Amino acid sequence: MADPKFQNLPGIAYDQPDVYETPDDPELDTSDYYEEEPENEAIERLHISPSVAHKRFSGATVEGSVDFTDRIGRRMCRGYDTRGSSDYELVGQGEKETPVQKCQRLQIEMNELLNEVAALQVDRKVADEEKQSYDAVATVISTARKVLESLKLEQVLGKEQTPGSKQVKALISQVEEFKQSGVLTAIPTPGTDLAATARVASLEQRISQLEKVLGAQPDKLSRLTAATNTTNVLEAVRHLSTKAALIQPDKLDTIEQRLTSLAGKMDAIAEKSSGSAQDAKRDQKITELYDIAKRTEPVVEILPHVIERMQALEALHKYANNFAKIIAEIEQKQGTITTSLVNNKELLHSVQETFAQNLETINSKVAKVEQRVAAISSAK
């Protein structure tokens, strides 16, 4: 029977049953028979597991600098770039980067540059001078990377400057943890949602008012904190107000008088410090004594032991001194004896010569006497 709401409508047959027709299924042109292709040894058939391939390329990204060719060169061709556990969000073309995104991009580029420099350092075809330059570049890059890591922009600038994808991933991980824990929480009532929304709106209003008063540019706040040496805005304002109070006209005369008296005192101190020629000589002697004391600092610790040793060896030194004096006297006496021996040798030589001459004269005279005696005896 037709629905009562369709009564009194034209074109409806009320005396016939309701029929719901469906189109017939078309005949399938395909057959269940598949002709197996003959095996060809020239065709390599690889057995690839979809799950293993998905795990391998799950975190891979493709950029404009990829190169899937098999060219041979000094640099390796880049294919799919797997970031690993560190996921960084890159902004689109024309969009403005946040400071954290700039820092992350610089870290990635520095890591790539360090890898390239390390590959060039290992290369044997590169000259030693180029390797030294690469070492200097690697040192500079590592220092800059340490500086970037020490900045900790996410902690300094807050969550407003961090990319939104990290917050989304953190929320997803929290949801997964809640699912695994199985702890159920009650859905908040609409009244609590409205109260939380009102609280958030009031906080946003207060933040906007603070941004209007202080400014939303972090570089200005950093300059203010650097100038006042404080991170509290009220303390900075008080510091600036005290400085502004000092610049008032009624206090400038007092400041000028104090500066004049201070300048006079500084001149007097400078005159006293200059001194006369005697003071200069005294300072020079003091400086020399100080230099001598600085040079003898390494010997100061050994000096008491040396003095004790010298005192212990004092008697031995005296005996050695006396022995040296005795040896000197003996050498002197030996010298005099040697000279006297030389003189005695000369005298002996002269005596021997005179004795030989006298002996010859005596022999000649004795011969003459014998001749005379013989002549006399023959004459008788």
UniProtKB/Swiss-Prot annotation:
The record gives the membrane topology as: Peripheral membrane protein
Q: Does the keyword Transcription regulation apply?
A: no
Compositional bias of type Acidic residues: which residue ranges? 21-32
Disordered, as annotated region: 1-32
Q: Which residues carry this modification: Phosphoserine?
A: S49, S58, S86
Q: Where in the cell is it found?
A: Cytoplasm, Cytoskeleton; Membrane
According to its UniProt entry, the protein's GO biological process terms are: centrosome localization; clathrin-dependent endocytosis involved in vitellogenesis; mitotic metaphase chromosome alignment; mitotic spindle organization; mRNA transport; oocyte microtubule cytoskeleton organization; oogenesis; phototransduction
Question: Could you tell me which InterPro entries the record lists for this protein?
Answer: Dynamitin
Ranges in a coiled coil: 100-135, 353-377
Q: Tell me the Pfam families matching this sequence.
A: Dynamitin (PF04912)
Q: Quote the cellular component terms of the Gene Ontology held in the record.
A: axon cytoplasm; cell cortex; centrosome; cytoplasm; dynactin complex; dynein complex; membrane; microtubule
Q: How does it assemble?
A: Subunit of dynactin, a multiprotein complex associated with dynein.
Q: State the name under which the record lists this protein.
A: Dynactin subunit 2
Q: Which gene encodes it?
A: DCTN2-p50
